[in-house]
A protein has these predicted regions:
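Metal-ion/cofactor- or nucleotide/acyl-coenzyme-handling active-site neighborhoods
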Residues: 1-265
Length: 265
């Protein structure tokens, strides 16, 4: 933190770059830890024991990871696919229907959301609508913390479902939560049913960011990102009234959107 006191009125104001505050993200689960743990226990029974994502050696394969940003260039994706015939396309649930609509069948779709399939997503869409059209060629990579209603829907529709474990503090015992990880090993709560030595995939709090960790775990090092839009030129008047925060947990509502500045240096 920087504190600057100007006692001479003839001095110029401090540069704007010194007034900027870096964006600091404190990730947290979107549902209570108990809810996530219950999801894991249920999915360990639903998912095939032999179809879990595990660590692969590094290879020269290429991959495309598609998030759900509004400025996704589908023509560029197709150009890459035509140039590299064996390239793999991994997407998130929100980009899955739009990819199909644009004639692109994803090799995989990564799913992480621990909330019910009947609920409304962060994009304002009922989650079940995102899985209305399902292509048998897509591998649906379902995190063990995913709500079982999603897993059951995919299984009922004869989808090719694979499981994976997303690392979160919810997997650890209360006394170990928040503690620094040593020797790249964590102790998982026994009651969750996750096998010892299971692959845990790290990354951000959304499926798109975990997708990078997923592809890295699968041995990919040449990854092309699409749809990772996190900014807009100007929020609408309606969006400016939107707030975020755990109100039930006692937090104060905060603006959902805020202005950021990107330094060119």
């Amino acid at each position: 933190h920087l504190c600057l006191l100007l006692s001479d009125e003839s001095l110029p104001d401090c540069p704007d770059e010194l007034k900027r505050v870096p964006v600091i993200v404190h990730p947290r689960d979107c549902v209570p830890k108990e809810y996530i743990r219950d999801n894991i226990v249920s999915n360990m029974k639903l998912l095939n024991d032999k179809k879990w994502v595990s660590k692969h050696p590094i290879h020269k394969g290429k991959a495309i990871l598609v998030s759900a940003g509004p400025f996704t260039d589908y023509a560029d994706i197709k150009e890459l696919m035509n140039k590299h015939k064996d390239i793999k396309v991994l997407c998130v649930k929100h980009s899955y229907p739009t990819l199909l609509k644009n004639g692109i069948v994803p090799w995989g779709c990564i799913i992480l959301d621990p909330r019910p399939i009947t609920g409304v997503s962060t994009h304002g869409v009922v989650r079940k609508e995102l899985f209305k059209k399902l292509n048998p060629k897509t591998r649906f990579m379902v995190a063990s913390m995913t709500d079982p209603s999603v897993t059951e829907h995919l299984i009922e529709n004869d989808c090719n479902v694979w499981g994976w474990h997303a690392f979160t503090d919810s997997l650890r015992s209360e006394e170990e939560q928040g503690q620094q990880i040593k020797n790249q090993q964590v102790k998982i709560m026994d009651e969750l049913g996750i096998p010892k030595g299971a692959t845990l995939i790290t990354g951000g709090t959304c499926a798109a960011m975990r997708g990078i960790g997923m592809l890295h775990t699968l041995g990919f090092r040449d990854i092309h990102l699409f749809g990772f839009d996190c900014c807009m030129e100007e929020p609408t008047k309606e969006q400016m009234t939107e707030t975020t925060g755990d109100l039930e947990g006692g937090e104060t509502a905060r603006p959902k959107y805020f202005q950021v500045t990107v330094d060119n240096n």
